[in-house]
Amino acid sequence: MSRIALYPGSFDPVTNGHLDVVRHAVELCDRLVVAIGIHPGKKPLFTTEERLVMVRRVFEPVAEAAGCAFDCTTYDNLTVTAAQQVGASLMIRGLRDGTDLDYEMQIAGMNETMAPGVHTVFLPASVGVRPITATLVRQIAAMGGDVSAFVPPDVAASLKSKFAG
């Protein structure tokens, strides 16, 4: 039986922090499914299709290099339901700090009650990516700042293009 892991997020945009999580996650599973959450109340910078392309372009080579099957999907329901729908027994969550841990522990507890077969795996962020958030990256890019230290090169180019003119 293969071990399937779901890594959910908005990925708006993909950051080096997300990439750090994926590099570790592919070592824990046979198949990694990155799930992009679609939230009706949120207005993302990148369209769903743009985020799907970004996620595939950045994460798929990492999974392939590790011998891990890779998939990308979207979901607009409960994250734990999305995990069940793809057959995941693991849900991957990255942690930057104690605030993340407190929040994620609450969510993990609720998810465990709703889906006892889906186990949350917390991956601590590597030191170099701990301060990175997609929100800060968007703000820096919107103000014309250089985000190349925080996102993969393709993503930096996409952000520059998004805010040009």
UniProtKB/Swiss-Prot annotation:
Its cofactor is Mg(2+). It catalyses: (R)-4'-phosphopantetheine + ATP + H(+) = 3'-dephospho-CoA + diphosphate. InterPro entries: Cyt_trans-like, PPAT, Rossmann-like_a/b/a_fold. GO terms for biological process: coenzyme A biosynthetic process. Substrate binds at residues 10, 42, 79, 93. Pathway: Cofactor biosynthesis; coenzyme A biosynthesis; CoA from (R)-pantothenate: step 4/5. One of its GO terms (cellular component) is cytoplasm. ATP binds at residues 10-11, 18, 94-96, 104, 129-135. Its main location: cytoplasm. Signal peptide: none annotated. GO terms for molecular function: ATP binding; pantetheine-phosphate adenylyltransferase activity. SUPFAM superfamilies: Nucleotidylyl transferase. Keywords: ATP-binding, Coenzyme A biosynthesis, Cytoplasm, Magnesium, Nucleotide-binding, Nucleotidyltransferase, Transferase. The record marks 18 as: Transition state stabilizer. Its EC number is 2.7.7.3. It is found in: Cytoplasm. HAMAP family: PPAT_bact. Belongs to the bacterial CoaD family. Reversibly transfers an adenylyl group from ATP to 4'-phosphopantetheine, yielding dephospho-CoA (dPCoA) and pyrophosphate. Homohexamer. This is Phosphopantetheine adenylyltransferase. The gene is coaD.
